[in-house]
UniProtKB/Swiss-Prot annotation:
Cofactor binding, per record: Binds 1 pyruvoyl group covalently per subunit.
Protein name: Pyruvoyl-dependent arginine decarboxylase
Record-level GO BP terms: arginine catabolic process
Cited InterPro entries: Pyr-dep_his/arg-deCO2ase, Pyr-dep_his/arg-deCO2ase_sand, Pyruvoyl-dep_arg_deCO2ase
E.C. number: 4.1.1.19
The keyword Cell membrane is assigned to this record: no
Keyword Nucleus found: no
Sites marked Cleavage (non-hydrolytic): 44-45
Pfam families in UniProt: PvlArgDC
Amino acid sequence: MRQGLVPKKVFFTSGVGRHREMLESFEMALRDAGIEKFNLVTVSSILPPDCEIVQKSEGLPSLYPGEIVFTVMSRNSSNEPSRRIAASIGCAIPKDPVKNFGYLSEHHSYGETEQYAGMYAEKLAENMLFTWTKEKPGKTMNISKTAEVDDEGNWTTVISAAVFIL
């Protein structure tokens, strides 16, 4: 059976960046998350079967600067003073994660707390898994980042990401 590019590991990270330019605020968020050195390719929301969730500190050394790296990423930016922005990734892990795939969800919003945005993303992933399997997940989790735009209206970007390791 052909498996192609199926990730063996995944780690979660998030970051915030601020700059007068929108693109540079995104770069600063990538740096804060520790994933600025890679050519990131966003993919949709499947957590492969038998994909081990590892800590960022374990996953990052497995990647090489300039490497093409697949990620599920949530991103939000604003330059509206005092605007709160959020970016979250939810994860629903099936009861048998060795045999079955799970779901990852992206949620980006305005005005929500980090906790609320994270729980919302987690619930999205749980619902996506349930509509496919008709079973509740074995475990759910999320990673979120929120920030408030400064009074000067500098661009602020938040990201949350599930980063795959092949």
